[in-house]
Amino acid sequence: MLPNRKPPRPSPSFQSLNNNNQRFPLRRSLKIAQAHSLPTVPSEDAKDDDLITPELSTDFDFREIQHRYLMALQNEQDGETTSTDDAFFELDDDDDLSSPSVPGSPVDPPSISVPLPPKSAPPCPTQPAPLTNGDLYPTILSNGTPIPNGRITPALSTVSVSLIHEARLQQSLSTPCNGSEEEMHNGQVRKESEYRRFKSEGSTAGASLPAAEKTHMDELSPVDQRSTSGTARFLIQQDSVVNPSTKMSNTEQVAMMHTLKTKLSKYQAMMDKAFEEIAKVEDANIIEGCTIVRKLMRKVWNTPKVSADLANALCDYLRDRDYFDKLIKMFISPNTAACDQVRMECGKVLEECTSSANLEYIVNKSYTKKIMIVAMKLNKTPDQQRLSLSLIGNLFKHSNAVSLSLIETDVIDHIILTFKRAPECPDILRHAALALANILLYTCFEGKKKIIQKKIPEWLFFLASQADDVTRYYACIAVCTIVSVKEFEPLVRKSDTMKLVEPFLQVHDPATFARDYHKYAQGNTKEWLERLLPMLQPSRRREARSVAAFHFTLEATIKKEQNKLDVFQEIGAIQALKEVASSPDEVAAKFASEALTVIGEEVPYKLAQQVPGWTCADVQYWVKKIGFEEYVEKFAKQMVDGDLLLQLTENDLKHDVGMISGLHRKRFLRELQTLKVAADYSSVDESNLDNFLMGLSPELSVYTYQMLTNGVNRSLLSSLTDEMMQNACGITNPIHRLKLTQAFETAKHPDDVEVAMLSKQIDVFISYRRSTGNQLASLIKVLLQLRGYRVFIDVDKLYAGKFDSSLLKNIQAAKHFILVLTPNSLDRLLNDDNCEDWVHKELKCAFEHQKNIIPIFDTAFEFPTKEDQIPNDIRMITKYNGVKWVHDYQDACMAKVVRFITGELNRTTPTTKEMPSISRKTTQQRWQTTNTVSRTGPSRSIGGPRMEPPTPTFTPTGSQERATSTRRKIQPSASTTSDRN
């Protein structure tokens, strides 16, 4: 007799198939064994709930049972009843049976009258043998591989046992028969238990109800959810373009539909009960009912595979039963104002239930602006502000006309004001980025123009600099949506936000990124993807193509789980992705190739970004790709490679290639110039000449290769004459020659020229510690740019090998140096006598070049207790005046920063009168030395040289307006990245 031990957990390879429903209770196992005359192996003290598997005979074949199951389903659809021999498929776990047969009784193979299944049916193992742990494993696999002594190796265990469980899964997916009254009652008890759990968790109104049984909700479902983790669920398991497995098996599709049908019926009943509670009108009952619906919808959005279909079906059910309309009326009703919690709970349900169909209902019923007005009034608490932004973002996902009508209100100002005053609330910042992304995707040219006037590109820089990945991601999508419009590209470039896009994409995996937000983890709608599709066009900026390709890879991973990959063919994304995948854009091509692999499409030929190394075949492919297929043979005949392609002139195209049409030549040269700017010359450019020309003006990069082939490097630039530029370097445009000439007027050394050019682009350099000061530094940058200052902040990567000099040149070029001091920002420079820390290097450079240093102190910052730990060359910073930053009074803080910049407050070098009165122990002690404040009328005059925290009554002088009016127009500010953590 075998010991009564439970079998081990199945291997992960078939865990998603058996769904934990493949083990049978004792009674069911015995009845199945009796129905097929199979011997059983009961344990000595077996109980009803013990898990045990019947021992199968040598001639037993699971393919036969699988085929019988399919025949039973067909008969059921045709109105026929199955025979009693098919009891294997009709039994429930709760069926009561008599005592089992004796284990040693003779066994006859089951007689099956139906024909055998086709050869395409999955192979099944035979001759299982019991092991010491109570499991049954086959001694001979279907391929004839023998297993000595009935033992199975780990390598074979997954294959063989998964086949058994797959067969059992198909058995469990048959349409359930009408059970007995007792069974129906048991099912009702299960639903009641789950309903009570929703009602009791996290709600005070239902505290008097009996507590629900402590059972995980997944255990109450007829078909359990997959037990794989969220991370594993989104991993791309396909890294080859050969026969990609993009389609679900029939078993998985049946399981998915069964799960959807079962859960939908159960959740609809729970919705009805929740709204019965809401119908009682009392505030406590309304809150209780809304809490149940909200938690239910939150669970639905987290359901694997079927979440989108299940959620949309429940949203339709709410609308069809007038529940959705009732929620809207309670949310916008003036009577609800008496109880903010009722309005909040109604709003949270609307947040989860605003599907495309329900949004159409809102628009048709003219509820849009009413909901918008009420949502904008939710601004008292962080939870209200989060809900406000979430509802606003959902309302924009309808059409251009609706979006434009909403933009004409103060909604953009409301969004900016909400997240501007909550920089330390990740949820608010996340929903702000989501709202702006939806607004920009669902609005027309006129709407985008109005948004640009609100300085949204600058604010997107702040959102794209946050620690939360979802916030950064949707901020990148939003800014790329704006820059896709050619007319807005110059304005967006000035904000520096575009420089944050590709560095973010390069360190993230689209396959695992979607899980970070429950509602967006199941993908966006077809209409949303259609609006993103134009960003893949070759005429768009490189960053826009990269973020679009990233998102389509993310969506492909999700849609594959949902078996909805056809949507990409329907919207025409396949061809667009193939074009991007074959382009020289490294980041965009990488993600486009991944998307095509997941979808199951062939990845096209990939061109390298190192154009000088292209072969003749590469050039011919590129010529065909840009639309000049009729000239491919001419390029092949002339054996044009990457080197010759970069040196082609209009005369070469006309006489050697035979491109007679002048318009054809112009269009070809336009594509060639774009290629020259995007090309990577690092293999032939040792002096970083291309980087220098790009820093002066991106359009000068088209001359890089011809200058390199003629032996020009950075050290020779100052010696070039106008004639040499025109003849040797090929700079035929006189304006371009003038730009280079002006760059060398103030200095002859290339480094001095670079500083001189940077001084025309930078007013303020911001130094900060990335680990703690990133958010505050990015906020200060945006606020300064809005006041007309050109700001440098090190957020982008510098070229390898030139990091030190390039960063310090920006400090030399700037007139003002802002040091953002946040908690622990000086810890890494303590006792740094070798000047290895980057904040130390930056501050030392600012002192050496006598910059106007302005410290900005976070409220939690404190100077080190021992002053001698700070290196001597920067120790003077402890005696500098500065601004204490308080987020509630940002305008007052920034006004004081402007006064430091304009010189109205004392300059950076401390006076001898100030030094004796300075105590250097902590910032808090320094602030305790308050100054005398005299009030005259509504204004304040602040005396004394020490720092004072800004207050709501602080009134800045008119210097800000005077300074802004005299400043030059905002210019794009350079940026870089350093190891500042």
Curated annotation (Swiss-Prot):
<feature type="compositionally biased region" description="Pro residues">
    <location>
        <begin position="115"/>
        <end position="128"/>
    </location>
</feature>
<comment type="subunit">
    <text>Homodimer. Interacts with rab-1, pal-1 and unc-43.</text>
</comment>
<dbReference type="GO" id="GO:0010628">
    <property type="term" value="P:positive regulation of gene expression"/>
</dbReference>
<dbReference type="Pfam" id="PF07647">
    <property type="entry name" value="SAM_2"/>
</dbReference>
<dbReference type="InterPro" id="IPR011989">
    <property type="entry name" value="ARM-like"/>
</dbReference>
<dbReference type="InterPro" id="IPR001660">
    <property type="entry name" value="SAM"/>
</dbReference>
<protein>
    <recommendedName>
        <fullName>NAD(+) hydrolase tir-1</fullName>
        <ecNumber>3.2.2.6</ecNumber>
    </recommendedName>
</protein>
<dbReference type="InterPro" id="IPR039184">
    <property type="entry name" value="SARM1"/>
</dbReference>
<dbReference type="GO" id="GO:0031267">
    <property type="term" value="F:small GTPase binding"/>
</dbReference>
<dbReference type="GO" id="GO:0019677">
    <property type="term" value="P:NAD catabolic process"/>
</dbReference>
<dbReference type="GO" id="GO:0140367">
    <property type="term" value="P:antibacterial innate immune response"/>
</dbReference>
<feature type="domain" description="TIR">
    <location>
        <begin position="760"/>
        <end position="857"/>
    </location>
</feature>
<feature type="compositionally biased region" description="Acidic residues">
    <location>
        <begin position="87"/>
        <end position="97"/>
    </location>
</feature>
<feature type="compositionally biased region" description="Polar residues">
    <location>
        <begin position="12"/>
        <end position="23"/>
    </location>
</feature>
<keyword id="KW-0524">Neurogenesis</keyword>
<dbReference type="GO" id="GO:0010629">
    <property type="term" value="P:negative regulation of gene expression"/>
</dbReference>
<dbReference type="GO" id="GO:0007165">
    <property type="term" value="P:signal transduction"/>
</dbReference>
<dbReference type="Pfam" id="PF00536">
    <property type="entry name" value="SAM_1"/>
</dbReference>
<dbReference type="GO" id="GO:0050832">
    <property type="term" value="P:defense response to fungus"/>
</dbReference>
<dbReference type="GO" id="GO:0044297">
    <property type="term" value="C:cell body"/>
</dbReference>
<feature type="binding site">
    <location>
        <begin position="769"/>
        <end position="770"/>
    </location>
    <ligand>
        <name>NAD(+)</name>
    </ligand>
</feature>
<keyword id="KW-0399">Innate immunity</keyword>
<keyword id="KW-0677">Repeat</keyword>
<dbReference type="GO" id="GO:0042802">
    <property type="term" value="F:identical protein binding"/>
</dbReference>
<feature type="region of interest" description="Disordered">
    <location>
        <begin position="173"/>
        <end position="225"/>
    </location>
</feature>
<keyword id="KW-0391">Immunity</keyword>
<feature type="compositionally biased region" description="Polar residues">
    <location>
        <begin position="972"/>
        <end position="981"/>
    </location>
</feature>
<dbReference type="GO" id="GO:0045944">
    <property type="term" value="P:positive regulation of transcription by RNA polymerase II"/>
</dbReference>
<dbReference type="GO" id="GO:0030424">
    <property type="term" value="C:axon"/>
</dbReference>
<feature type="compositionally biased region" description="Basic and acidic residues">
    <location>
        <begin position="182"/>
        <end position="200"/>
    </location>
</feature>
<keyword id="KW-0217">Developmental protein</keyword>
<dbReference type="Pfam" id="PF13676">
    <property type="entry name" value="TIR_2"/>
</dbReference>
<dbReference type="GO" id="GO:0061809">
    <property type="term" value="F:NAD+ nucleosidase activity, cyclic ADP-ribose generating"/>
</dbReference>
<comment type="function">
    <text>NAD(+) hydrolase, which plays a key role in non-apoptotic cell death by regulating NAD(+) metabolism. In response to stress, homooligomerizes and catalyzes cleavage of NAD(+) into ADP-D-ribose (ADPR) and nicotinamide; NAD(+) cleavage promoting non-apoptotic neuronal cell death. In males, involved in non-apoptotic death of the linker cell which guides gonad elongation during larval development. Required for both innate immune response and specification of AWC(OFF) neuron.</text>
</comment>
<dbReference type="GO" id="GO:0030425">
    <property type="term" value="C:dendrite"/>
</dbReference>
<dbReference type="GO" id="GO:0050829">
    <property type="term" value="P:defense response to Gram-negative bacterium"/>
</dbReference>
<feature type="region of interest" description="Disordered">
    <location>
        <begin position="908"/>
        <end position="981"/>
    </location>
</feature>
<dbReference type="GO" id="GO:0034128">
    <property type="term" value="P:negative regulation of MyD88-independent toll-like receptor signaling pathway"/>
</dbReference>
<dbReference type="GO" id="GO:0008104">
    <property type="term" value="P:protein localization"/>
</dbReference>
<dbReference type="GO" id="GO:0019901">
    <property type="term" value="F:protein kinase binding"/>
</dbReference>
<feature type="compositionally biased region" description="Polar residues">
    <location>
        <begin position="74"/>
        <end position="85"/>
    </location>
</feature>
<keyword id="KW-0963">Cytoplasm</keyword>
